[in-house]
From Swiss-Prot:
Cysteine disulfide partners in this protein: none
Name under which the protein is recorded: Putative pre-16S rRNA nuclease
Keyword entries, A-Z: Cytoplasm, Hydrolase, Nuclease, Ribosome biogenesis
Predominant place of localization: cytoplasm
GO biological process per UniProt: rRNA 5'-end processing
GO molecular function list: nuclease activity
CDD domains for the chain: YqgF
Family to which this protein belongs: Belongs to the YqgF nuclease family.
Enzyme Commission identifier(s): 3.1.-.-
One Pfam family in the UniProt entry: RuvX
UniProt-listed Gene3D superfamilies: YqgF/RNase H-like domain
Species for this entry: Streptococcus pyogenes serotype M49 (strain NZ131)
Length: 139
């Protein structure tokens, strides 16, 4: 059963996919979106859903450190509602506090990647961490 993890931002959506057994997550790509133009990357998501035979989604919820909803939580839930309606697949939500911070730390400490290159992969790695955290907690 393949699960797709998404890190939804205002300009990009980081995408990750689980292995068929649901043990590990791997970052796939970053989809550019434009909220102001109502371009949400659903066409590309549909291609990936078909390619990987996705059966469910996990979307990161950007909560505040005190467990209240951050400013992007509503946007993430709305995005989840759209993909649930479009694909008819279940959508789960995973607390994503500090995943982007953790992803950036990993890129600096383990890969020694420059700031410019980090911006190109950070959302994909954050999606991977969101999905891996979900897999670790649920399987």
């Amino acid at each position: 059963m393949r699960i797709m993890g998404l890190d939804v931002g205002s300009k990009t959506v980081g995408v990750a996919i689980s292995d068929p057994l649901g043990f590990t997550a791997q970052g796939l790509e970053i989809i550019k979106i434009d909220e102001e133009k109502a371009e949400f990357g659903f066409t590309r998501l549909e291609e990936l859903v078909k390619q990987y035979q996705v059966e469910q989604f996990v979307i990161g919820l950007p909560k505040n450190m005190n467990n209240t909803n951050g400013p992007r939580v509503d946007a993430s839930i709305t995005y989840g509602s759209h993909i649930e309606h479009l694909f008819g697949l279940p959508v789960h939500y995973q607390d994503e506090r500090l995943t982007t911070v953790e992803a950036e730390r990993m890129l600096i400490e383990q890969a020694d990647i420059s700031r410019g290159k980090r911006k190109k992969v950070i959302d994909k790695l954050a999606a991977q961490l969101i999905l891996q955290n979900y897999l670790n907690r649920n399987f």
